[in-house]
Amino acid sequence: MSALEHEVASQPQMWRTAAAMGAEAREALPAAGARIAVVGCGTSWFMAQSVAALREAGGLGETDAFTPTEMPPGRRYDAVVVISRSGTTTEIVRALRAVPPGTPTVAISAVPHSPVVEAAGSSILLESADEQSVVQTRFATTALALFRASFGEDLRPAIADAERALTEPLPFDPVAFEHFVFLGRGWTIGLANEAALKLREACQAWTEAYPAMEYRHGPISVAEPHSVVWSLGEAAPELLEQVAQTGATVVAGELDPMAELVRVHRVAGLLAEAKGLDPDRPRHLTRSVVLQS
C-alpha cells in the first residue's frame, strides 16, 4: 500500500480529530467580523479559497484568499491566517514577515517549530494529519474540516459520507477516461481546483476545474466521450443535462463535497497504479518549495 492510500483511508478519523478541536480553533482563529486574508500555496491555496467562501457565506466577515506572492501590497487586514503542511514553504515565511506590525497572524501546520510556525504570532497544529506522501490529501481536508468545525458546523454527516466514499464503488472506471473536469460553486470551487490538481500531481492526468456555471461559456467545447465531468456539490440540472449531451460521463456529487474529494483521491491512486506511477513521489515535485535566499 502506498503512503497515499493509507493517508486517504485515514481521513474520517482525522476529521473527527478536527471536529473535537473546533472550540479550540474558534478561540485561536480571528473572531467573527474580522476582515482577514487566508494564504497558502498549491493545495493550501485551494483550501484557503474554500475557507474564504465558507466564512463569508456564514456572515463571519470579509475574507480573501491569496497565494503569498499575489497578496496586494499595502492592503490592511485585521488578521492573516496561513496554511502550510510542512511549515517550510519559503513564500509563506516571507509573506508572514511582510505583514504590517501589529497585525495578528495564525499558522495552520502539521509541523511544530517549523519556520512558518516560528514566524507566525500563533499556531494551530495538526500533527496527526502530517503525511509521508508528497501529494497532499488528509492534511488539506483536515485543515478545512477544522475551519468548518470552528464556524460551528456539525461534521458528523461529512464524516459519515467520507466513510461511504472509501467503501462504496466509484461511479466510473477511471482507466476508461482520459480527461477529467471538476465543477464547483461557492466554497466548492476551491475543492474543484484541488481535485484537478490531485489528478495532475498523482497520475499526470489531463484535468480542468471551473465554477460550475462558467463551464458552458467555452470549456464545454472539449468535452467528449472520454471525458468525466464531476460536480462537487450542487449543480444546476440543466447544466448537467447539457454536459451529458456531449457524450461525457457526468458525476453529480451526492456526498458532502469534502467526501467527494475523498473519492477523487481514490481515483488518483488507482490511475497512478494503472500507469505505473508512484503517487507518493510525483515527478518534478518535492514536499515543499524551499527557495534560496
Give the residues covered by each predicted segment.
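Glycine-rich phosphate-binding loops that contact phosphosugars or nucleotide phosphates
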Residues: 34-160, 166, 185, 228-253
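N-terminal amphipathic/basic leader segments beginning at the initiator methionine
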Residues: 1-15
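Internal, active-site/partner-interface "lid" segment
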Residues: 111-112, 119, 149-177, 277-293
